[in-house]
UniProtKB/Swiss-Prot annotation:
Organism name: Bacillus cereus (strain ATCC 10987 / NRS 248)
Species lineage: Bacteria, Bacillati, Bacillota, Bacilli, Bacillales
Signal peptide coordinates: 1-28
GO molecular function: copper ion binding; cytochrome bo3 ubiquinol oxidase activity; cytochrome-c oxidase activity; oxidoreductase activity, acting on diphenols and related substances as donors, oxygen as acceptor
Name the UniProt record assigns to this protein: Quinol oxidase subunit 2
Main location: membrane
Length: 291
């Protein structure tokens, strides 16, 4: 009886604890606020995984509670001795098959979502993606638009409703590019190009950040992603092409040196004199910065 009372007292504290926990959440978590097809697919996977694991936890705790109460030691069965058993084929089959089924139920949607994120979202297969090279440096982000022949630092403009093919690389320590409301993160590494497809469904401002610690300036590696209508995006590109200064090699080498900088805009990009696919990409910047 005392055990039952203690259990129900603890159970009654659960709703109050949950309310206290939720009281600290003054706004939506970015990861749980998908604003594009890639983020939506990953959000659905998170929800499915959470529900399945919650069901498993609930079943385990219910069985644990039932066994704890029903088969606890009582005064009337102090001398009870359970029969000797050498195995139960049915139970052994069940506790072998159930984990296999759980793993399959988690694996199939995970694999499908992972492979789907490595290409243009199926809803936008008919739309040509905008290609943007993303370069992480200590401690800033460079965004190069090869077709538009422009480059930005620490901010990014994209057209809404259009898939974006990001090509990720680095001129410093390994980093991770992440815009939580548009999709999952991916690493940036020297001498490598990693593809990442994202898309914003509607115009808006989304916060991007580094998801990999890279030293003292790590906290400054945030950037704004502004999704614009196609008309406003084209207008912005034209303005940059006509009014922004050129990005010279000297200026580029100054930017990639370790340090914190503000937003910058240029009417040319560093891809015209640096090949990010080359294994000498990192060494090029290292020796240039030593001069």
């Amino acid at each position: 009886m005392q055990l039952k009372k203690a259990f129900w007292k603890l159970a009654s504290l659960l709703p109050x604890s949950l309310l206290l926990f939720l009281g600290g959440c003054d706004k939506k978590l970015a990861v749980l606020n998908p604003q594009g097809p890639v983020a939506k697919a990953q959000y659905d996977l998170i929800v499915w995984s959470f529900l399945l694991m919650s069901l498993i936890i609930a079943i385990v705790f219910i069985l644990f509670t039932v066994i704890l109460i029903r088969y606890r030691e009582k005064p009337e069965n102090m001398d009870y001795e359970p029969p000797e058993q050498h195995g139960n084929t049915l139970l052994e089959i069940i506790w072998t098959l159930v984990p296999v089924i759980i793993v399959i139920a988690l694996s199939i949607p995970t694999v499908k979502a992972t492979y789907a994120s490595e290409e243009v979202p199926k809803e936008s297969k008919h739309i040509k993606p905008v290609e943007i090279y993303v370069t992480s440096a200590n401690w800033k982000w460079l965004f190069s638009y090869p077709e538009e022949k422009i480059e930005t630092v620490n901010y990014l403009n994209i057209p809404a409703g259009v898939p974006i093919q990001f090509k990720l690389t680095s001129v410093g320590p390994m980093n991770a590019f992440w815009v939580p409301e548009l999709g999952g993160m991916k690493y940036t590494m020297d001498g490598m190009i990693m593809d990442l497809y994202l898309q914003a469904d509607k115009p808006g401002s989304y916060l991007g950040r580094s998801a990999n610690f890279s030293g003292e300036g790590f906290t400054h590696m945030e950037f704004e992603v502004e999704a614009k209508t196609k008309e406003k995006y084209d207008k912005w590109v034209k303005e940059v092409q006509q009014t922004a200064p050129k990005l010279t090699e000297d200026k580029y080498n100054e930017i990639v040196k370790p340090g914190v900088v503000g937003r910058m805009t240029f009417s040319s990009h560093h891809l015209s004199y640096v090949d990010p696919k080359s294994l000498e990409y990192c060494d090029y910047n290292y020796y240039k910065n030593k001069k």
